[in-house]
Amino acid sequence: MKKFFRKIAGYIVTIYANRIYRKAVKEADRVHAERGEMIYVASSIEDVRELVIYNRYKFRQMKKRLFIPKFYISNLKDGAWYFTPDRSGKNGLTEQEREVRRLAFVQHVLHRAKLV
């Protein structure tokens, strides 16, 4: 019976993680369409299950405020769950990369919920 409830909890957490991811990606795409700048979707520092949207300026402010000297934009790009293309439309994620990162986020949330 315990395995059954664990499996149901896994499905619910998976649905929850997919919902959070899609919402953050939609918001990042909306901001990118308005401003044209590169937007990154990464995990929040306070709550790993929460996704935060950064642009480069906001990232630099957070870096100064939290005193993270060894974290650069290239680290953010590698560690982000999603990022939009730049102004010229280059350097964005392909559909395959996007799907891989979505699945990695779902696995990350399942791991944090101790269901994997």
Which residues are covered by each model-predicted region?
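Acidic/polar low-complexity segments and flexible, solvent-exposed patches
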Residues: 2-116
